[in-house]
From Swiss-Prot:
Source species of the chain: Mycobacterium sp. (strain KMS)
HAMAP family in the record: Pantothen_kinase_3 (MF_01274)
Gene: coaX
NCBIfam families recorded: baf, PRK13318.1-3
Family membership noted in the UniProt record: Belongs to the type III pantothenate kinase family.
Protein name as annotated: Type III pantothenate kinase
Classification via CDD domains: ASKHA_NBD_PanK-III
Complexes and interactors: Homodimer.
Length: 267
């Protein structure tokens, strides 16, 4: 059983993956709040409580974090609480198998890399990956499996919260689908702007990529979405053909499998 940990700015996804290669399957997944000051002991207490008896069945662990301080604590947690379990952390120097054709490869978030790796592995073609997180990342992988870059925009919830925080007349609202694109009250107006507005943003970016990037105008380009808020927005997005809830976890597994031989026997 592989333990996969995906730490983002606001939330952390913990998954258990059985099998490997084409037989791999995410059997459990949890989403918890990210605490930027959490210690290795606190992380271990939380994760051990989630995975329960499967803690004794772990054959490997893999993690990424967009929060540098948490990355260190996750590594420390694995070394202290599961010392006999080989683990891989996604960071510079780890083999991902995906060339980064950008100005500064070290700037590229680990989440973006593993998403593109998973998309290319699944479809075997050029792909556009849309990750609906605290930021919306629209990333591009070539037909050769190369990371070409992408676009980053504020996420749906982050933008809605920012609007409420900076305006005395607005308040934080629950992000649900409004009755119409034309809101009849302030809450519906904010919901409309968030949901339909970001659906248009995603369509605009995907269409622009198809127009501007050589080789991306054809039907053989896969467009896949992932992320917690994706199901909320995708019904109004016209350019995304696939949704994969486990895309990041699958990418983490792929990186672990590429690096596990060097991790065997690690103490």
């Amino acid at each position: 059983m592989l333990l996969a940990i995906d730490v983002r700015n606001t939330h952390t996804t913990v998954g258990l993956i059985s099998g490997s290669g084409d037989h791999a399957k995410v059997v459990q997944q949890w989403r918890i709040r990210t605490e930027s000051e959490a210690t290795a002991d606190e992380l271990a207490l939380t994760i051990d409580g989630l995975i329960g008896e499967d803690s004794e069945r772990l054959t490997g662990a893999v993690g990424l974090s967009t929060v540098p301080s948490v990355l260190h604590e996750v590594r420390l947690m694995l070394e202290q609480y599961w010392p006999s379990v080989p683990h891989v952390m996604i960071e510079p120097g780890v083999r991902t198998g995906i060339p980064l054709l950008v100005d500064n490869p070290k700037e590229v978030g680990a989440d973006r890399i593993v998403n593109c790796l998973a998309a290319y592995h699944r479809f075997g073609t050029a792909a556009i990956v849309v990750d609906f997180g605290s930021s919306i990342c629209v990333d591009v992988v070539s037909a050769k499996g190369e990371f070409l870059g992408g676009a980053i925009a504020p996420g749906v919830q982050v933008s809605s919260d920012a609007a409420a925080a900076r305006s005395a007349a607005l308040r934080r609202v629950e992000l649900t689908r409004p009755r119409s694109v034309i809101g009849k009250n302030t809450v519906e107006c904010m919901q409309s702007g968030a949901l339909f507005g970001f659906a248009g943003l995603v369509d605009g970016l995907v269409n622009r990529i198809r127009e501007d990037v050589a080789g991306f105008s054809g039907t053989d380009v896969a467009v896949v979405a992932t992320g917690h808020t994706a199901p909320l927005v995708l019904p109004d997005v016209h350019t995304v053909a696939h949704y994969d809830r486990h895309l990041t976890l699958d990418g983490l597994r792929l990186v672990f499998e590429r690096n596990r031989d060097g991790q065997r026997g690690r103490r």
